[in-house]
C-alpha cells in the first residue's frame, strides 16, 4: 500500500482501519471506502491460512475487494483479544501512512455458537445461556473497541478532521437482548465518552446502528427473521463512507446514528 495514487501525483488517500472486516458489515464498510478511494487496512482472524469457523471470508479477500473497488487495501491477520497485536497494527499504519482519518470499530465476538447452528440457544433467558457468550461479546467486542481506540487516539488526534465509528445496535436503547444489549449499550457509551474527550482535538466519534443486515451469518437463519426491510453490508458501508466524507461530521459527534437515518441524510440506498 502506498500513500499516493500511482503515477498521478494526486494527494495522499485518506486512510481507514476497519476491524473485523473479513466478512459481513466490516467487509461492506471496507469495500465502500475503497469505492470512495480510501486506503483501507482490514483486520480479522480469518485468513487464507485458516478461518475461525465455517463462514466464508478472509482478510486477504476483503483487502482485494477494497483495491478492486478503486481504493488500496491491506489485509492484516489480527486477533483483537491480543492487545500487543492490535498495537502492532496501529504502529504499522503510522509507519506506512503517518495518519489515520477513520477508525471503524466493528470487530465482534459472541456469535460463534450461533454460527455453529445454535440459533435457538440465543433466544434463551440470560441465566440459561452459556457464560462464554457474555465473555466473547465483551472481550472481542466492547474491550476490543476500547483497545483499538486507545492505541489509535494519538494518530487520530494528529490527523485533521478524523472520525471514530463504533458499530453498535439500537437494541441498546431498551427491550430484551441479554448480553448482546448490554454490550451494545457499552459500545454506545464508549462512542459518547470518546466524543466528549476528543472533541477539543476536532476528532468526531459516533455510534452507528445498522438494522437487520444480510450478512453471511444472518442469512443462515433467514427463515427465522423478517428481512423485508433489511440492509446489505455494502449499503451499510455506503452510509459509513458518506458519513466519513461529511465536512460537518463534528456536529454529529456523540450521537448514535441509525443507518436508515444516514441513508436519508445523504440520499443513498442501503438496501442493495
Predicted feature residues:
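A short, exposed helix-loop element centered on a Lys and neighboring polar residues
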Residues: 149-150, 192
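Catalytic loop of short-chain dehydrogenase/reductase
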Residues: 109-116, 120-133, 137-138, 157-200, ...
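Canonical Rossmann dinucleotide-binding motif of NAD(H)/NADP(H)-dependent dehydrogenases/reductases
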Residues: 8-47
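C-terminal helical subdomain
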Residues: 207, 223-272
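A glycine-rich helix->loop->beta "capping" turn
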Residues: 11-12, 69-72, 92-105, 110-112
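The beta1-alpha1 cofactor-binding region of Rossmann-like NAD(H)/NADP(H)-dependent oxidoreductases
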Residues: 56-57, 77-90, 131
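Active-site loop of short-chain dehydrogenase/reductase
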Residues: 13-14, 71-72, 99-100, 155-169, ...
Amino acid at each position: 500500500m502506498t500513500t499516493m495514487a500511482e503515477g498521478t501525483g494526486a494527494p495522499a488517500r485518506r486512510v481507514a482501519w476497519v476491524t473485523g472486516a473479513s466478512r459481513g458489515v466490516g467487509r461492506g464498510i471496507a469495500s465502500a471506502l475503497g469505492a470512495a478511494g480510501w486506503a483501507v487496512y482490514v483486520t480479522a482472524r480469518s485468513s487464507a491460512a485458516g478461518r475461525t469457523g465455517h463462514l466464508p471470508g478472509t482478510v486477504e479477500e476483503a483487502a482485494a475487494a477494497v483495491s478492486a473497488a478503486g481504493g488500496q487495501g491491506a489485509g492484516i491477520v489480527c486477533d483483537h483479544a491480543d492487545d500487543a497485536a492490535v498495537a502492532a497494527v496501529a504502529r504499522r499504519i503510522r509507519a506506512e501512512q503517518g495518519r489515520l482519518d477513520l477508525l471503524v470499530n466493528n470487530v465482534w465476538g459472541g456469535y460463534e455458537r450461533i454460527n455453529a447452528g445454535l440459533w435457538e440457544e440465543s433466544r434463551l433467558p440470560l441465566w440459561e445461556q452459556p457464560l462464554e457468550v457474555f465473555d466473547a461479546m465483551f472481550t472481542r467486542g466492547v474491550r476490543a473497541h476500547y483497545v483499538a481506540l486507545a492505541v489509535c487516539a494519538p494518530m487520530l488526534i494528529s490527523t485533521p478532521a478524523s472520525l471514530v465509528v463504533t458499530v453498535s445496535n439500537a437494541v441498546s436503547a431498551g427491550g430484551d437482548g441479554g448480553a448482546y444489549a448490554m454490550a451494545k449499550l457499552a459500545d454506545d457509551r464508549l462512542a459518547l465518552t470518546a466524543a466528549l474527550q476528543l472533541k477539543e482535538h476536532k476528532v468526531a466519534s459516533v455510534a452507528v446502528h445498522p438494522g437487520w443486515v444480510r450478512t453471511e451469518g444472518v442469512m443462515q437463519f433467514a427463515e427465522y427473521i423478517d428481512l423485508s426491510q433489511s440492509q446489505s453490508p455494502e449499503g451499510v458501508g455506503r452510509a459509513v463512507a458518506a458519513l466519513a466524507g461529511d465536512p460537518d461530521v463534528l456536529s454529529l459527534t456523540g450521537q448514535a446514528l441509525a443507518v436508515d437515518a444516514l441513508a436519508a441524510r445523504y440520499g443513498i440506498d442501503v438496501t442493495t
